[in-house]
A protein has these predicted regions:
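Residues forming the flavin
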Residues: 1-50, 56-161, 165-528
Length: 528
């Protein structure tokens, strides 16, 4: 197989033009080869001449002869590495593995265990995806919160109500990344997510995909129980014996995968009481910022709209004078700011996009790093206490609605009274307020400095009427559940997994960690 890199075409090229370009590059007839796109990225450094840049793998009969006659540093021989799931171990497993949580980590752990014959049982405290969507829509419209089924909890996890980004910075030579994208495509995602530089699905598409993954798992012997919250774990001599559900039912189990998600605070508290080792983890907090999407497009594309490129996205970072980092996170082109609360009397926000990314605003979190030294205590749950305090203040400031402030007023530390040209694109009620008043001073100062710095990179980013809303507090898990190189916690049979356990950040990396934990289990235990 031949790999070609740095293959550039105009952004409005056709598939035929790509095929012809490959033929010219390899100096071979157009009908003599097949190809697969490995990667597509955008080069917009020259706004008047934007290019898609491709990496492609080409299968051609006379590969050696072509490589001899074509001397080009961007052309090389390559071999495709195929992902291999391990063979089952020898330890007898009496009961099916229990997986707590049906986010990407739990779903992908369940998928691979089911495929290998382990008949996993998935417990999910929230509702099935379609019912969950109805519950979330009702919350956004009427403010009635279901603490167990919301933007954070329910089938698909917190990522279901997000932009659905699938890119990850995790380097994985074992091929799990490609496995995740392949499974998404087989569950209904568009084929191009496999090779796009910044693939995304959108909330409307993700809901159907996670339901399809569930059906696949069930067809392979797995099972699901919704509105089934793990409320306790019962141990005997350092080994897992039972999983308690809804404070009543006890399920015998030798293996339990904790794919909890980053917001399962009550579960973290229970695990801490039960002596499961965990530690506080640095994370980041801040606000959502909204700008006109047309402005971001102009900054990055040199035009307000381009049918071949869609809504533009950005990523910005800055190191502040106080030593803290401030950066954009979970940027949602053509998206919405959403009320992402999961506890009564506390308010958190997140960003979300549909597949079309056709809202008039771009939004992103602007977040500032915080560490255990910022937390009110040095216990494993100190970060949770820090989050809860900020969310309580946000809820009180907006009286249950999302508090919003113009950047010009944020700089003056005064409540906003009217919108400028930028108007909110939000899911859930909102109210003009002084958002800065609830932030720790270091966080507020860092966001102001960051906004001004980003305005020097992206024209208009620091405009007076840019909207800030909060609080963005669920950027990653505030704890890490300690696990060994075999994937186990200090309690035999407990496997921490995914973002909530502190081993991932985002949909794809969480799914990859789910596969990794499935491998740990398979390497040790026999299947049924």
């Amino acid at each position: 197989m031949i790999r070609i890199t740095q293959l550039k075409l105009s952004v409005n090229h056709t598939e035929v033009q790509l095929h012809k370009k490959i033929a010219r590059t390899l100096k071979c007839p157009e009908g003599s080869f097949s190809y697969e796109i490995i990667r597509q990225s955008l080069d917009a450094r020259h706004k008047e001449d934007k290019k898609f840049v491709y990496t492609v793998d080409v299968v051609v009969p006379n590969e050696k002869q072509i490589l001899k006659k074509v001397h080009n540093k961007n052309i090389m021989s390559t071999e495709k590495k195929k992902y291999q799931f391990p063979k089952p171990g020898s330890t007898r497993l009496v009961h099916p593995p229990v997986i707590v949580g049906s986010g990407p980590a739990g779903l992908f752990c369940a998928w691979y265990l089911a495929k290998a014959g382990y008949r996993p049982l998935v417990l999910e405290r929230g509702e099935q995806a379609s019912r969950r969507k109805e519950t979330v829509d009702h919350f956004w419209k009427n403010g009635v919160l279901n603490p167990d089924s919301n933007v954070q909890f329910g089938e698909g996890g917190a990522g279901t109500f997000s932009d659905g980004k699938l890119n990850t910075l995790v380097k994985d030579p074992n091929g799990r990344n490609h496995e995740v994208l392949k499974r998404f495509v087989q569950a209904g995602a568009p084929q191009e997510i496999v090779y796009q530089q910044k693939p995304h699905l959108g909330t409307d598409v993700l809901i159907g995909i996670v339901e399809t993954l569930r059906h696949q798992i069930e067809e392979m012997g797995g099972s699901f129980r919704f509105e089934a919250k793990m409320t306790d774990l019962l141990f005997e001599e350092g080994h897992l014996k039972e999983v308690e559900v809804n404070d009543q039912e006890k399920i015998p189990a030798e293996v339990c995968v904790l794919a909890l998600g980053h917001s399962a605070r009550d579960t973290f508290e229970m695990l801490n009481r039960r002596g499961v080792y965990m530690e506080p983890k640095p994370f980041a907090v801040g606000l959502r910022v909204e700008h006109p999407q047309s402005m971001i497009n102009m900054d990055l594309y040199g035009e307000e709209e381009n049918e071949f490129l869609g809504a533009a996205s950005y990523k910005v970072t800055h190191t502040c004078e106080n030593g803290r980092g401030v950066y954009s996170f979970c940027m949602c082109p053509g998206g919405y700011v959403v009320n992402a609360s999961s506890e009564p009397g506390r308010l958190a926000v997140n960003g979300m996009s549909y597949q079309a990314r056709d809202s008039k605003n771009a939004n992103s979190a602007l977040i500032v790093t915080v560490s255990p030294s910022d937390f009110p205590d040095d216990t494993p749950l100190g970060g949770i206490a820090f989050q809860r305090d900020l969310e309580r203040k946000a809820w009180e400031l907006g009286e249950g609605r999302i508090p919003v402030q113009l950047f010009g007023d944020f700089r003056k530390n005064q409540a906003s009274t009217d919108f400028g040209e930028v108007t909110p694109q939000m899911k859930g009620g909102f109210v003009l307020s002084n958002v800065r008043s609830i932030l720790p001073k270091a966080v507020g100062d860092s966001i102001e400095e960051g906004m001004l710095a980003f305005g020097r990179k992206l024209s208009g980013f620091d405009r007076e009427d840019a909207l800030l809303s909060g609080i963005e507090s669920r950027t990653s898990s505030p704890v890490r559940i300690v696990r060994s190189k075999e994937g186990l916690s200090n309690i035999e049979g407990i496997y921490p997994c995914g973002e909530g356990a502190g081993y991932a950040g985002g949909i794809t990396s969480a799914a990859m960690d789910g596969i990794k934990v499935a491998e740990f289990i398979c390497e040790k235990f026999r299947n049924f």
